[in-house]
Amino acid sequence: MRASRPAVHPVEAAPPPPAAAAEGPEAQVEGAAHPRGVRMKDPPGAPGTPAGLGLRLAQAFFAAAALAVMASTNDFPSVSAFSYLVAAAILQCLWSLLLAFVDIYALLVKRSLRNARAVCIFTIGDGITGTITLGAACASAGITVLIGNDLNICAENHCASFETATALAFISWFALAPSCILNFWSMASR
C-alpha cells in the first residue's frame, strides 16, 4: 500500500562530500560540484517565503479595500460591471487570504511549498483569480469613464468612489501578477 505524500516538503542542505570536507574550505569553493538532489532556494515572492506572504497580504488588502469602497456606495448594484467588481474582489480576497494562511503555516514549520501539485494549484488559482480581477477592473474602468467623461453625470453618481475602487482593484491585480508569474515559472521549470 502506498502512503500519501505530504504537500509540504522540508528543504535541507545536503552534507558536504567527505573528500571536500577533509580538504578544507578552499577545495569546496574552487571545484565543488553541487550534490545531486539538492534544491536551490526558493526565489523571493514564491509560495512559502516571507515575500510571498507579503504579496498575498497586499492582494487581500487591496481587494478588501476595493470591496469596501465599492460597497460603501448605494448605487453600485445598478451597474453590472460594478457588481462584477465586487464579486471579483470577494473572490480575490478569499483566495489571497487562503494562500496567506498556507504561507504562514509553511513559514512556521519551515517547509518549502515546491510540491508539483501545490504549485500547479497555486498557478491555476492565481491565473483564474487574476483574469477575473483584471476583467472586472477593466470593465469598471470603462463604465467609470462612460459615466464621468461621456455622459457627464458624475453629480448624480459616486464617481470618486467608483474610480477609487477600480484603482484599488488594479493595484490588487498588480500585486497578484508577480505571484502568478513566479508560480508559473516554478511549475514550468520542473
Curated annotation (Swiss-Prot):
Disulfide bridge positions per record: none
Chief place of localization: membrane
Ranges of the Cytoplasmic topological domain: 1-50, 103-126, 186-190
Record topological domains on the Extracellular side: 72-81, 148-164
Region of interest (Disordered), residue spans: 1-31
Topology term for the membrane: Multi-pass membrane protein
One Gene Ontology cellular component annotation held by this UniProt entry: membrane
Keywords assigned by UniProt, alphabetized: Cell membrane, Membrane, Transmembrane, Transmembrane helix
Sequence ranges of Low complexity compositional bias: 1-12, 20-31
Subcellular location: Cell membrane
Pfam families, per the entry: CASP_dom
Domain of life: Eukaryota
Transmembrane regions: 51-71, 82-102, 127-147, 165-185
Assembly, per entry: Homodimer and heterodimers.
Family: Belongs to the Casparian strip membrane proteins (CASP) family.
Name by which UniProt lists this protein: CASP-like protein 5A3
Species, as recorded: Zea mays
